[in-house]
Amino acid sequence: MTQHVTAARPAAIRTRPGWRVWNLAALTALTAYSTGVAWQAQFVSYPLYRAMSAAEFPGYHLAYNAAIPGVVIIPGFLSFLACAAFPFARPAGASRTAAVVVAVTGIGSLLSTVLWAIPMHDRLDAIGQDPATIASLLGANAVRTACLTLATLALSWCTVRLIGRGQVSS
């Protein structure tokens, strides 16, 4: 009787999701959110920079920058950094290749933001509306959007595979 109970326990433990599975689920949701924000910026927010008058642009850009920390900056940087660390936190059933893809896209998103997009925003603050700077900002965001999209696809694929294997049931 004792052996039967002991033998049944490991099977029950194996089917219970651990922190790595919950981390995957949370990272997938966070990265999907950041991906949506990036697509919105690419096709709505940043193109509207061109539609403003030069006189109205500085005030608008300052207001935009003040409005985005909680909905864009914090989730974005959390996503970039968590993606970069994903190979160290991936669940056992998640592909190593997918984990590397997620990490590379996290690093790519971080670098395109810090080394390219932020300097373009700073330049817009300094010189005002400038078509070349807006075009460069769109380029930086295109890289970030592509990286985030690829990360979301890879994370979603990992999640679907784990669900298909029954490794996410509680």
Per-segment meaning from a language model:
Residues 75-85, 145-153:
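Core segments of transmembrane alpha-helices
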Residues 128-157:
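Alpha-helical transmembrane segments of multi-pass integral membrane proteins
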Residues 38-42, 84-94, 114-121, 156-166:
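Transmembrane helix-loop junctions and nearby membrane-interface residues
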Residues 2-7, 163-170:
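Short, charged juxtamembrane terminal tails flanking transmembrane helices
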Residues 3-13, 17-74, 119-136:
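Interfacial loop at the N-terminal end of multi-pass membrane proteins
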